[in-house]
Amino acid sequence: MNLAARIPHLARFAVALVFAIYLFNPSPTLAQEEPEYPVDPALMKGMKWRNIGPYRGGRAVAVAGVADDIFTYYMGATGGGVWKTTDGGVSWKNVSDGFFKTGSVGAIAVAASDPNVVYVGMGEAPIRGVTTSHGDGVYKSTDAGKTWTHLGLERTRQISRVQIHPKNPDVVYVAAQGNQWTANPERGIYRSTDGGATWELVLHVDEKSGASDLSMDLSNPRILYAAFWEHQRLPWKVVSGGEGGGVYKSTDGGDTWEELTEGLPEVVGKIGVAVSPANPDRVWAMIEADDGGFFRSDDAGKTWTRVNKQRILRARAWYYTHVIADPVDEETVYVLNAQMMKSVDGGRTFKPIPTPHGDNHCLWINPHNNQTMINCNDGGANVSFNGGKTWSTQANQPTAQFYRVITDNRFPYHVYGGQQDNSSVAIASRTDDGGIGREDWYPVGGCESAFPAFDPNDPTLVYAGCYQGIISEYNHATKQSRNIMAYPFLGLGADPATLKYRFNWNAPIVASPHDPTVIFHAGNVLLKSSDRGQHWQEISPDLTRNQAEKHGPGGGPITNEAAGAETYNTIFYVVESPHEAGTIWAGTDDGLVHLTRDGGQTWQDVTPEGIGEALINAIEVSPHDPATAYL
C-alpha cells in the first residue's frame, strides 16, 4: 500500500476496527454454539449521559466577539463544538450540539453589520497528528447561534480563518488549509457572495499548500492578504515548508491575486498575516523560515523588513504562528506562541502577557476598545476587560480532551484519565452532596498523556505516564510521586533512532488483573516490573514494523519537532487477558497485533489481514470467551 493510500488509516484515531480473532480452543464447551439472548433496546432508553467533570477547559483555537456587546463571545473547541457566553465568560453554553456533524472548530467570525450572523469553519488548523480531528466545512447561524445551517466545503478538512465583509454579511471568505494527511484540491481561499449558498475557489496554489491565514483591510474590504503553507502530517514527522508557501494580496475582492515577495524569505513554512485596522498600509507577517522572523510592511505589502528575529516568537511554528494587529494603535501588535507576546514599538521588542494557560492560538480584540479581548489556548478561552491584566476563568468550560479513561472499583467509583495539555485526573462519579466539585478530583501523577494503571480494588498507588517514556508512581495516601522510568533519559529533540526505546506520546501502562503489583509499560518492546518500577525487564522483541527510515527528526525541512509526539513504530495498546495470566495482547501504531500465552517468552503475529499500516487504538478481550478479542 502506498503512503497516500494508508495515511487516512493512520489518521483515524477513534475508528473502531472490529475483528473477532479465534486463536485457540481452551475447552470443549467454548467450541459449542451458545444460544443468543437478544437485548431489548427499550432497556437502554433509561440510560443517559451525565457530565461528571472536571470543569476545566480543553484546547480551543477559535474565538470571536460581538463588537457592540462587550459581554458576548463565541469559542470554538477542538472537540466540543461552539460555545457562547453572554456574561463576559462567567458562564458558557454549547450552541452547536444537535446541528454540527463534527466537533472540531477551526475558525469563527461574527458579522460586524449584523451580529446575528455567525460563520464557523470546521477543523482545527494546528495539525497535531492523530489527536487532530478534521472538520466538515462551514456552518452559519442567522439567529446568534440558536440554529445552524451547513454550507458545504466538507472536503476542506481544516479551516484556519473566516473573514466577513464589514458591511455585507453575505460576502464571506474562507481560508481552507486542507487535508493534513494527504494532498487534496479543496484548499485555498474560497469566496461566497450569497451568504454561503455557493462557493468559488478564488485562490489556489497547489494540492499540497493551503491557506494558513487571511486578513481583510476593514477600511477597504476589497483588499485581502492571504498566507499559504505547504505542509503535511505524517505519523512520524510534521512537514512544514516548501515552494508552495507565500503571502498573496488581492485588491479586487479576490478576483485576482499577486504574490508579495520583496524582502521576504524564498522558502517558507507556516505564515501568519495581519493588516492593521489603525493604518491599512501597515501589514505584519510572522514567517517560519531559515531566515524567518517577524516582518513588517509600511507600504501595503510592496516591500517588507524583518524587524524581529527572536526564536521565541516562531518556536514550534506549525502549532502557533498567529499575528493580531491592535485595532487602535498601529505600533501595537500581538504574536501568539506558547506565550502571548505584545509589542508596542512596531514589533522591535516583545513582552509576554500572562494568560491562564499556555499554548496560545487565538485573540480577538474589540474594534471599539482595545482593552476588551478574548484569548484562547490549550486550556480554553478567557475574557479580559483590561488589556490582559486579568482574565476570566477557564474552570467553567467542560471541553477537556482525554487520552484514556479507566475506572476503579470503589463506591462511588472514580474515573481516571490524562487531559490534553493538563494534568492527569481521578474524579468521583458521584458524591453525597449536591454535585461533583473541585474537591472531588485530584491529579494522579504523569502528565497530559497519562495512561493510568492501578489495582482497581485499592487504587492507593497509581502509575501514570507522560511523553518520551516518563512514568511515575503516585501514592494517594502520602500525596507523593516518584519517577520510575524504565530508561531515565529525556530525549527532547533527539531522533528516535538514537534512543534505547521508542515510546509513543501516549505509551501504554497496564496493571496485571491477576497480580496488580505487576505492571507493564510499552515502548517498541514490552517492559515488565514486579517491584513497583524499581526494576524493569524486556519481555518481548521489537513488536513493531521497525522502519528505520521513519526514525529521524520529528519535523522539517525548516523546524524540528522535539516533544516526541512523532516517535513512530511504537506499541500503542497492551492488555492482559482477564482469563489467563501471561496471555498478553499488544497492538502497535503501525498496524501489527501480537499475542503471547507464556508471559512473553514467545510471541505470535496475529495481525488480521487487510488492516495495513493502521493505528491499533484498543484491544478488548471478550469477558465471555478467552479466544475472542476485538480491535
Describe the role of every protein-language-model region:
Residues 11-26:
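Bacterial N-terminal signal peptides
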Residues 32-631:
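Beta-propeller blade termini and top-face loops
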